[in-house]
A protein has these predicted regions:
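Conserved C-terminal alpha-helix-loop-beta "cap" of PLP-dependent enzymes
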Residues: 287, 291-375
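Structural motif of enzymes handling amino- and sulfur-group chemistry
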Residues: 236, 244-245, 252-301, 305, ...
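Conserved PLP-enzyme active-site core in the AAT-like
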Residues: 50-267, 302, 385
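Glycine-rich, N-terminal phosphate-binding loop and its surrounding beta-alpha-beta segment
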Residues: 1-19
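Long, charged amphipathic helices and adjacent flexible linkers at domain junctions
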Residues: 47-57, 314-323
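A short linear hydrophobic-aromatic micro-motif
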Residues: 4-5, 217, 356-361
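Glycine-rich phosphate-binding segment of PLP-dependent enzymes
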Residues: 11-12, 23-48
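Short Gly/Ser/Thr- and Asp/Glu-enriched loop/turn motifs at secondary-structure junctions
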Residues: 9-13, 223-226, 329, 361-367
Length: 392
């Protein structure tokens, strides 16, 4: 029987497509997963002493070296990281957060609800569109706070008459009032902002330099690794999270740990990371390379003799995963107009294609095959699916 969870071609151009599993893993990470899955491992065993060890020690050491932090901890996703941080640092006390940062994420889940599940009392500060340093200081004076919480509004942008408090300013307030500053970066850029063809996503190291006591982010977004929630920051605070009962409930599994360690090791050489981590490579591929792939795909479709008209067009594509929502990256796509049926019918047939479904999008009456997220080795299967899908 065919597996329900299966390989599909992502022809949408969205590199971090949440519904399609976000970041594909690097070959090194896939090899590490295979090795861990098919064998016993030293997951919680210290080979040097024969004693029990920490399952997350290896990735924590790598994270501290790569990000320049005192300590690190890893759980199963970023929502879990936020939950654990607030449960360990602010249960029964207040956590101040700007009203403009109380976002709703995918599937209808709201940040406020996650914060409240930790046992912290959410103290909203400021107005929806404008929050000032005075708002946080007033909250610190008038409430029994333990945490100043800052959420990066990674899935939307507010423009116009707006004002926000920077992480650096917030951290200074935290020091003044003896409060922990927790920053949820969402995607979390592991490289400096200049390494990406878009702006607006804060780098992890920058957040730590700006004074955040705790920084958390996802493993399967800009990092390009497996699903994971990564916590970095002050050793004393990380230690409290590590010993919290929720840490057991939220712990990361061995296969994700294997993939995460392999991914982090690639970042020891940023150039290698850019070449070998698929999500990073797709986001940074030059438009001329994408055009060449579109030419190749278009030629294959023509050679198949598909009953359709095709054209290579320039397109704009989002990053995905709630990252850089205002950024649209340059790319190229093959636009397909079937000759004998509706384009919606072709789109549905591609989704049902066997053995390899193709997920594309429709724009201005044509089906677009965006080459930013189609691998070269997938192009023949895409061309064959287009031919089969255009048959009346």
């Amino acid at each position: 029987q065919t597996m329900r969870l299966r390989h599909v071609v992502n022809a949408t151009g969205v590199a971090l497509h949440t519904n399609l599993g976000r970041a594909p893993l690097a070959d090194a990470a896939c090899t590490a997963v295979q090795e861990a899955a098919s064998n016993y491992t030293n997951l919680e065993y210290t080979l040097e002493t024969g004693a029990r060890g920490s399952r997350t020690a290896a990735v924590e050491e790598l994270l501290c070296v790569l990000c320049g932090c005192e300590a690190a901890f890893v759980v199963n996703n970023n929502a879990a990281a936020v939950l654990l941080a607030l449960a360990a640092l602010s249960r029964g006390k207040g956590a101040a957060v700007s009203r403009g940062e109380l976002v709703e994420i995918g599937d209808g889940f709201r940040l406020r609800d996650i914060l409240e599940e930790s046992g912290a009392r959410v103290v909203e500060v400021g107005a929806t569109n404008r929050t000032h340093t005075d708002d946080y200081e007033r909250a610190a004076r008038e409430n029994d706070l333990a945490v100043l919480f800052k959420a990066h509004t990674s899935n939307f942008r507010m423009v116009g008459f707006t004002q926000s408090v920077s992480l650096r300013e917030l951290a200074r307030i935290g020091v003044r009032y003896g409060l922990a500053t927790v920053a949820d970066l969402g995607g979390g850029a592991p490289l400096d902002e200049a390494a990406y063809p878009f702006s607006g996503e804060p780098s992890i190291s920058r957040a730590l330099r700006d004074g955040a006591d705790i920084v958390c982010f996802s493993g399967d977004k800009l990092l390009g690794g497996p699903q994971a929630g990564i916590l970095l920051g002050r050793a004393e605070l990380i230690g409290r999270m590590r010993l919290h009962p929720l840490a057991r409930a939220l712990r990361i599994d061995k296969l994700s740990l294997a993939a995460l360690e392999a991914t982090l090791r690639l970042y020891c050489d940023p150039a290698r990371a850019g070449n070998e981590i698929p999500a990073l490579r797709m986001l940074c591929t030059a438009p001329e390379t994408l055009r060449a792939r579109a030419v190749y795909l278009n030629k294959l479709i023509e050679q198949e003799g598909a009953n359709c008209a095709t054209e290579i067009i320039s397109v704009k594509r989002p990053v995905g995963g709630g990252c850089a929502p205002s950024a649209l990256l340059d790319g190229f796509a093959v636009a397909v107009l079937p000759a004998a049926l509706h384009v919606e019918t072709l789109e549905a047939r591609l989704r049902a294609a066997a053995p390899l479904p193709v997920v594309a999008r429709i724009s201005q009456g044509r089906l677009l095959l965006d080459t930013a997220t189609i691998r070269d080795d997938e192009c023949p299967a895409v061309a064959a699916a287009v031919k089969a899908g255009c048959v009346l």
